């Protein structure tokens, strides 16, 4: 089973970001280290702007009239490539790597959507926060298996 080790402080920062972004999805980058096969250590988070916009939606061909709501930051997120590149460069200087992405699901469960699955990268952790009526209600981590399906990833609290 895949494991991600996270401090309570970082989990709290992720939940706070999710609550502040409500009713929109928040997103950010998980920086850390690979401790062993299928074990990651989260060292810091980098909150990012949700860069989802009409152009992004066009690129994902989501503009059917019955899916208008899915083209907003209330139901979709993306991180600008520049933010990912900057995080990668800063991490390299500190012997850290991008180990995953976090985002929120406003008024939905902390379970990945099909869109989340299709856009996910193998080897990354995906922490999802369910925010119900402006309060973080649940937080779970996921990763892809070899068949590109999400499987639950155990979160171990570290000090």
Regions picked out by a protein language model, each given a short descriptive name:
Residues 1-98, 107-159:
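Conserved beta-strand-loop surface patch within small alpha/beta domains used
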């Amino acid at each position: 089973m895949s494991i991600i080790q996270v401090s309570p402080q970082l989990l709290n920062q992720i939940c706070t970001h999710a609550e502040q972004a409500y009713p929109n999805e928040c997103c950010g980058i998980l920086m850390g280290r690979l401790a062993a096969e299928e074990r990651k250590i989260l060292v810091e988070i980098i909150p990012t702007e949700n860069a989802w916009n009409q152009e992004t939606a066009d690129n994902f061909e989501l503009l059917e009239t019955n899916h208008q709501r899915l083209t907003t930051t209330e139901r979709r997120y993306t991180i600008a490539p520049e933010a990912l590149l900057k995080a990668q460069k800063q991490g390299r200087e500190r012997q850290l790597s991008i180990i995953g992405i976090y985002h929120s699901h406003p008024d939905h469960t902390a379970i990945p959507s099909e869109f989340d699955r299709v856009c996910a990268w193998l080897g990354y952790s995906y922490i999802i926060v369910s925010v119900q009526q402006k309060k973080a209600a649940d937080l779970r981590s996921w990763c892809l298996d070899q068949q590109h399906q999400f499987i639950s990833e155990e979160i171990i609290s570290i000090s």
